[in-house]
Design a protein with these regions (language model features):
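Long alpha-helical repeat scaffolds
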Residues: 228, 232, 259-260, 329-363, ...
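Flexible helix-coil transition and linker loops at the boundaries of alpha-helical arrays
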Residues: 34-46, 78-92, 123-134, 165-175, ...
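Residue register of alpha-helical TPR repeats
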Residues: 44, 49-51, 92-96, 135-138, ...
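TPR/TPR-like alpha-solenoid repeats
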Residues: 52, 59, 79, 97, ...
Length: 426
């Protein structure tokens, strides 16, 4: 940002008068004033111009004007880059301006440009880490999520590996670390790196077990993790290890049904359940999508607005498709079950996402899980060879839902029936 070749001193006086007015300048007046003053004294006024531009971009009147907000953010980025490199907080101002620019680019659907901005942010934080010796990785997590939405799973997995390695020495809270490990494992699996995914998820299972044993974390979360771990092992052909994981899950659920949680827990069990449930259905979701997909293992609050909207907008279409096939269910049972599970999983994720009062959403979700079990029983009656495995899977889905709803006895009944269908009820 180069100074104007000619400075109008009347403009400078008016700019200073605006800033010193007793009523105070509006945000727009502040921007106009600092645009002028930054030409006179860039060292002092360029940082103030950056802050003023970003403040104006927050203005309520511009809430739905993403092109205008983007223009302000881009001007803020240019102003921040023009600040002398030796100025304190220059990089922090630039990082903040880039973050706002990234958000507006994504809001306008300009995802490739948004990714490029994120790459700049990651580079800035890496330079901070090299100078301070303390990793700065907030942009790295955003970068990984964005890469995963574009299907660039190998790059996303590498970014998440760096993220997890950076935050673990900082001793993050249990929920943050558990979700980070789940997201990393899911992204590794999406990248086809199944052995690494299993190793990452084993760390999560061990972490959950330790937290539950020490009464620091919910036993329900350990149950969900064991269920998902067994599914991963099955997918990799490790049938005996998968069966052993389900026996451990049975022991955890039996304790919950007998004594309940060992201590009163926070409301963070349902989000973890919803994350693992959506991950288990992610393969089918990707096959049905032709745009940005939600990253496996990440909650909807981490997704981009576009990915979130696409995911939830399909609920109405799924319901119509399910209702159409349900008019003659016996002709379409396998496809009906597949679509019904997609509908159930998306509905569960939506209910958990839109409110922290998850218990209030249970009446809406219960019929979906019950319908899924009834459809699977019909398939089992028509085709026991294929139906028993499907019924076991749907019963386990409902068991995890009932656990999230703190209906532990009913959850245990479902889980035991599922193990019986799999021949694992010994």
């Amino acid at each position: 940002m180069s100074p104007s070749p000619k400075i109008d001193h009347d403009d400078v006086l008016r700019a200073r008068a605006k800033l010193l007015a007793t009523t105070g300048p509006t945000r727009r007046e502040e921007v106009e004033a600092y645009r002028v003053l930054a030409q006179v004294n860039p060292a002092t006024h360029l940082p103030r111009l950056v802050n003023a531009l970003l403040s104006l971009s927050y203005d309520h009147g511009l809430r739905d004007s993403h092109p205008l907000r983007l223009a302000l953010c881009e001007e803020a980025v240019a102003a921040a880059r023009a600040i002398d490199p030796g100025t304190p907080d220059r990089e922090k101002l630039l990082f903040r301006a880039l973050l706002m620019c990234h958000r507006e680019l994504y809001a306008l659907g300009r995802r490739a440009e948004g990714l490029a901005v994120l790459a700049d942010m990651v580079a800035i934080e890496r330079s901070w880490g090299e100078l301070s010796g303390v990793p700065a990785v907030s942009a790295l997590h955003l970068w990984a999520t964005a890469l995963a939405e574009e299907g660039r799973h190998a790059e996303a997995a590498d970014a998440l590996a760096e993220w997890v390695a950076a935050i673990r020495p900082l001793r993050p809270d249990f929920d943050t670390l558990a979700r980070s490990l789940a997201e990393w494992a899911a992204t590794l699996a999406d990248a086809g790196r199944t052995d690494e995914a299993l190793s990452a998820f084993e760390v999560l299972v061990d972490l959950d077990a330790g937290e539950a044993t020490a009464d620091r974390g919910p036993l329900a979360c350990h149950f969900y993790a064991l269920v998902r771990y067994a599914e991963l092992l099955d997918g990799c052909g490790h049938a005996e290890r998968a069966a052993a994981a389900r026996q451990s899950a049975l022991a955890a659920l039996t304790e919950l049904a007998t004594t309940g949680e060992r201590k009163v827990q926070s409301g963070d069990q349902a989000p973890f359940w919803a994350i693992l449930l959506s991950w288990s259905a992610a393969d089918g979701e990707r096959l049905a999508s032709d745009g940005p997909c939600p990253p496996s293992g990440a909650g909807p609050r981490q997704w981009s607005a576009e990915a979130r909207q696409r995911y939830f907008d399909r609920l109405a279409t799924l319901r119509e498709q399910v209702n159409t096939l349900a008019e003659d269910p016996d002709r379409h049972l396998p496809e009906l079950l597949r679509l019904h599970r997609m509908l159930t999983v998306r509905s569960a994720v939506q209910c958990e996402h839109r409110t922290y009062a998850f218990a209030a959403q249970l009446p809406e979700l219960q019929p979906l899980f019950d319908e899924g079990v009834e459809l699977a029983r019909r398939l089992d009656a028509h085709d026991p060879a294929a139906g028993s495995r499907t019924l076991a899977e749907v019963l386990i889905d409902r068991s995890t839902f009932r656990t999230a709803a703190c209906r532990f006895d009913a959850a245990l009944g479902d889980f035991r029936e599922a193990l019986g269908l799999r021949g694992e009820d010994h």
